[in-house]
């Protein structure tokens, strides 16, 4: 946590003194809560269970309640809620009854951004990594930004930090269309893909129009940074009536990458920018998708006057984000070791990008995947895409779908996914019942030199650390924060 530094003056929210977060342990909520704590507000919050996140906030002065009860919100001047919280929640019901304002998290983020130089990163994929890269490069350039990220920035040990400069860098969440609350000065659109379609009534055109509306929240002197490699971003570009800069591998992009070369975790490439000398950079993340994330960062850093030296330093020194191709360590097996990787990818596009990165960085190694689909609705809507991409693993174990509050949907489960993948004839997936200890199932499948990838947005996030500590893998070697083996 940043001590109570002198930051850009934050206009007082009139009578607001105590801010209560319903679901404060959520990744989108805790960061905003931490920044508000550092700004001097009283912060309280509730969640269903304690976690390292709630314990961290409590150590900084937040009052944490376990469980949702009406009295938790009694002293609040405003309630902050995520889209997962509805009016049946007793704290929300009490606030509404007492005429205490109830605002979505994005509206509170917009309030923080309103008086700062806001940089908002939107897109179906790559938001967290791109936001983190921008924060890293700005820090290397001495700009000390405030940031709110949807993942743990390894170098900072947190997903939010109050900086001393005018910059606020944050993710813009399209999943519930709440990014329309934001009014940044600079906005990034990394890509636009079919996800969270219930928010948009299943209408992809509505999703595209909402992204255009988000970009039109920019002032006339703002900047839209857009990935030209994404066909949908390219399609909406003529509709955006704001200054734009494009990036990608495409020859007609304003800022583009050439000479890409991957060596394990490191990716090297050359950046071409208008009226600039070519710039050779490297980033400690594999895959072309991370080259694109880096290009978005370079566009913004260049526009804000960050030196090339700081850009190179910020990218090369980037230590990654929690659960984004996070190397946990090495597991011992007969004849050698297996590299253990954890990743948050839960959309077929993200899964494909990670598999491609593994093939590019370690072409000689087998990929053993433990995958947990996230949400029955996503599994149903993108079923064929999941079948196609998961079939590219060498060995596949499929955990049952993580429901994320949804009821099961017939035909949208992991057992059926296994059958569909098996019918392709490429590999024979193994179905994993809910609650099964995976270590005894995984170990016999591993060979020396394999890469074991645990992937998904549900509780599979706890699998990699469990495997590292399992007695079946005694002698496992943990990686350092930046993913290097100790």
Swiss-Prot record:
Gene: murC
MF terms (GO), sorted A to Z: ATP binding; UDP-N-acetylmuramate-L-alanine ligase activity
Source domain of life: Bacteria
E.C. numbers: 6.3.2.8
Uppermost EC category: ligase
HAMAP family tied to this protein: MurC
Function: Cell wall formation.
Family: Belongs to the MurCDEF family.
Pfam families named in the record: Mur_ligase (PF01225), Mur_ligase_C (PF02875), Mur_ligase_M (PF08245)
GO cellular component: cytoplasm
GO process terms (BP): cell division; cell wall organization; peptidoglycan biosynthetic process; regulation of cell shape
Residues annotated for ATP binding in this entry: 123-129
Catalysed reactions listed for this entry: UDP-N-acetyl-alpha-D-muramate + L-alanine + ATP = UDP-N-acetyl-alpha-D-muramoyl-L-alanine + ADP + phosphate + H(+)
Species: Pseudomonas fluorescens (strain Pf0-1)
Key words of the record: ATP-binding, Cell cycle, Cell division, Cell shape, Cell wall biogenesis/degradation, Cytoplasm, Ligase, Nucleotide-binding, Peptidoglycan synthesis
Pathway: Cell wall biogenesis; peptidoglycan biosynthesis
Name of the protein in question: UDP-N-acetylmuramate--L-alanine ligase
Keyword Glycoprotein found: no
Localization: Cytoplasm
